[in-house]
Amino acid sequence: MRYIAHRGYSSEYRDNSINAILWAIHLGYDGIEVDVQLCGTGEIILYHDVYIDNYFISETSFEVLKKFGICSLQEVYDKLPKIIYKDLILDIKGNNIEVVGALEKFYMRRPTERVTFCSFNRRILKILPDYYKKGSTFETTFHPREYDMITQ
């Protein structure tokens, strides 16, 4: 059995935060799942919802989002270099399919053997395997017939 910290160690720290991820690493979790999406200025940020307060994430600059305590994937790798030794599950949120290209660019010179991509968004899943062959992918769904729809 492998233990994955959902949104980092989110029972003690804010979901998808540097501290939540750091604490999950400290506690010895095998992996960490975080939610990622593109913000209005193109950074890959860690946040679950498509909006915060009255701001849509996809239309809001990273500078504004940082005021809410939102971090970027770049910051995770900069501040937590040990993340490369953990399984990292990136749950891709939102509807902006440009996130796939941003992830490809981000991981161009980083190890991806322990990175897994998942999403509820069929459009993202359809292009992810063709657009980005490194790492692995899986679909997150609540509906059993979704798999048949995505593979057709």
Where are these regions (language model features)?
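Phosphate-group recognition and catalysis centered on beta-loop-alpha active-site segments
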Residues: 1-152
